[in-house]
């Protein structure tokens, strides 16, 4: 997972260098996915994460942006990351039983200041 995390961060930095801040999250997601393909990092997009309630799987609309090798990636393009963004990725990680998550905010001048790593 550490190797995958490094590749994801490297790919995100490449996207940010090319595009800079200020675009839509969907643009950064498309470009990051393209970079992951170029770096041979297998991933899935918008995978449904069910909630198990009283033994029943329910689709409640939880869909992380990207999951690559059990690393959850949530992409933002906001003025500043808020607690709700952290809660969102932590919820995905708990429901999907993933141990590692990256919250990446592309709306910063230096991307390294927009990356938060979460471990459960």
Annotate the PLM regions.
Residues 1-42, 112, 117-120:
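Solvent-exposed, charged helical/coil patches
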Residues 76-120:
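Nucleic-acid nuclease catalytic cores
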Residues 20, 64-81, 92:
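Conserved catalytic cores of phosphodiester-cleaving nucleases, focusing on short active-site segments
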């Amino acid at each position: 997972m550490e190797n995958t995390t490094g590749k994801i961060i490297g790919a995100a930095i490449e996207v940010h260098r090319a595009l800079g801040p200020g675009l839509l999250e969907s643009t950064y997601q498309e470009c990051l996915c393209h970079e992951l393909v170029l770096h041979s990092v297998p991933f899935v997009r918008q995978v449904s994460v069910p909630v198990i309630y009283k033994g029943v799987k329910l689709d409640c609309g939880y869909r992380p942006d990207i999951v690559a090798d059990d690393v959850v990636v949530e992409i933002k393009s906001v003025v500043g990351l808020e607690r709700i963004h952290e809660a969102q990725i932590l919820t995905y990680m708990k429901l999907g039983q993933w141990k590692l998550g990256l919250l990446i905010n592309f709306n910063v001048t230096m991307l390294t200041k927009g990356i938060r790593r979460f471990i459960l």
